[in-house]
Amino acid sequence: MAFADKPNHFINFPLAQFSGFMGKYLKLQSQLVEMGLDCKLQKAPHVSITLLDIKADQYKQVEFAIQEIIDDLAAYEGDIVFDNPHMLGRCLVLDVRGFEELHEDIVEILRRRGCTADQSRHWIPHCTVAQFDEERETKGMQFYHKEPFYLKHNNLLTDAGLELVKIGSSKIDGFYCSELSVWCGERLCYKPPTPKFSDIFGYCCIDKIRGDLEIGDLPQDDEEAWAELSYHYQRNTYFFRHVHDNSIYFRTVCRMKGCMC
């Protein structure tokens, strides 16, 4: 199994949009300044869900993986807990709990899509507050925040989102300049015309659908392509909507509710 031990990207969960968290986070950073500590403050608070070693032509697979994790985890909810400020190497970080299942699932989906994800060393979820030139004593600092976490889109807006970020990317207004981002609150929510994909499609349609899409969108093997499209169609996931938006033939068959071959 390949690991991203020399990563060039990471899956990012940005935090700057959570006002309750940010109020406490900025207060902690101001304490460092008041103490006269020479440090570099983190300008884009986030949690790195996993690291990747990928090429630009794999971005689409990463986007599909992120959409799949959001779609499949329709009931994914709980709390994200930030606490225990401490030094991790030369960085002051917060412990983070609540992303464990998300981490495991996104790594599994990315690997299934041919992406090198996660490292051979144990993943330690954390949120960086500041970086020092050398290790510092930080005893006495306190921090605690619990943020409700919802990764579901049932017509409700949510602040949750995932991004693909290239390591070393610049930061603007509290966010990384990402290669792509998927925000739950911006998702399309229309449903397939029937729960039975096979009722209106035949295997012979796959080539016509594939011809409307970009190379690599659908597997070249017809059975694999059929299985993938059927899976996402019946679950109203992002990939169904991607094909619906980009394939004239697919939209026609959906509208006619009958095979046009």
Swiss-Prot record:
Keyword set, alphabetical order: Host cytoplasm
GO cellular-component term (any): host cell cytoplasm
Keyword Zinc: no
Subcellular compartments: Host cytoplasm
A Pfam family: Corona_NS2A
Main location as per UniProt: host cell
Top-level taxon: Viruses
Keyword Calcium: no
Similarity comment text for this entry: Belongs to the coronaviruses ns2a protein family.
Function recorded in the entry: Not essential for virus replication in transformed murine cells.
Protein name: Non-structural protein 2a
